[in-house]
A protein has these predicted regions:
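Short, electropositive alpha-helical surface patch
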Residues: 25-41, 94-107
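Active-site-adjacent pocket scaffolds in enzyme catalytic domains
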Residues: 74, 79-168
Length: 168
């Protein structure tokens, strides 16, 4: 991590580092190092366990996982956490509401034009990635995949072999 942070500093790059609660608890010094270098710390949920996928979790459990990871990351970093990326990019219609309720303002879980959905968890549900907007947008309060008027902004990550294809 120090080499990566040095490289980013050399070129004036600021990034968002997404950590699961599990990793943050094991390696708090890594989270703190990124935060102290001026980078944003984002939540990546509680863990990557299959049963912790936001596409299968009930709303109440999503809220608990978000509250847990947000508080842990804020306690370690000393900074407010407002960005989220779902583990394995697995979300449900309830995820947008859960994010808003727990104080998140940015989501980065909808990788438009992602083509690995046949090979990953929740693959049938990921077909929505093919029609999601490719540029940042305000989400619908009940659906991260479509534009709306909520206070949650979706910043789609590029997730194709050609780096620029998911962001143009």
């Amino acid at each position: 991590m120090p080499k990566l942070l040095d490289l980013y500093a050399k070129y004036g790059i600021k990034a968002t580092f997404f950590y699961t609660g599990y990793i943050a608890k094991l390696y708090p010094e890594v989270v703190k190092m990124a935060a102290d270098s001026g980078h944003e710390i984002g939540s990546h949920g509680k863990s990557h366990l299959k049963e912790n996928g936001f596409d299968i979790m009930p709303y109440e459990k999503q809220v608990k996982h978000l509250e847990y990871s947000k508080k842990l990351l804020e306690d370690i970093s000393g900074k407010q956490v407002i960005s989220f990326r779902a583990p394995a990019l697995r979300v449900s219609p309830n995820t947008a509401t859960a994010l808003l309720e727990t104080g998140f303002r940015i989501d980065s879980s909808i990788a438009s034009q992602r083509f690995d959905f046949f090979l990953s968890f929740g693959s049938k549900k990921k077909i929505k990635f093919l029609y999601a907007p490719r540029l940042p947008y305000r989400t619908n309060r009940n659906n991260l995949f479509i534009k709306g008027q909520s206070n949650l902004v979706e910043i789609p990550p590029s997730a194709t072999i050609i780096p620029f294809a998911g962001t143009t």
